[in-house]
Amino acid sequence: MTQPGPSTNTGPEFVREMARSFWYSAILRAAIKLDVFALLEDRALTYQEVADSLGASPRYTQAFLDCCVVLELLEESTGKFTNSSNASSFLVKGKDSYVGDHALHHTNTWVSWGRLDEVIKDGKTILPFETGFVDPDTYWTNYMTGQHNRATSGQSRQLVENVDLRDKRNLIDLGGGAASYSIALCEANRQLKAVV
């Protein structure tokens, strides 16, 4: 496995790297779904300890954790694995900066993207839950919590910093989802009342 990102190859490796790039998001998705980052937050574990905690195959767990190291999701020292600073900041559930649900939402669309040739020819969108990859409840839950992740991980702060509502009293938020942005705007502008 090689490091993700833009390839500097100009030969056939350029095509090979592009073709296998979805592996990286598959590794990220698995780590999020297995809650590996919560398990390794503030502690170092061997692959066997991780496998035991997950009830997983030690052999496959070791290979998986090694891939996470290559992708800089985890760090390894003397046979023990810990979160990288990015994983600790953005992939541990419960932190305001968590964006794991947003990543799950994107990976829920794999099968649809895998059929892009059909979409182009037929001119019809294929929704992820129409493919059977995820059920509608999971898709929409990941979508909504993913949008909330975006807000709490910095976008709502940017909105507050760039929109002056000091002289406004009312806000109507159409399509406001979890009201993440409205909450941030109202907290920054105490006179503001929002209807979502």
Model-derived regions, located:
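Conserved class I S-adenosyl-L-methionine
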Residues: 167-177
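Conserved Class I S-adenosyl-L-methionine-dependent methyltransferase catalytic core
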Residues: 2-5, 12-33, 38-44, 52-53, ...
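Conserved SAM-binding loop of SAM-dependent methyltransferases across substrates and taxa
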Residues: 178-191
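Preference for long, well-ordered alpha-helical segments
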Residues: 139, 177-178
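Conserved SAM-binding motif I beta-strand of class I
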Residues: 193-196
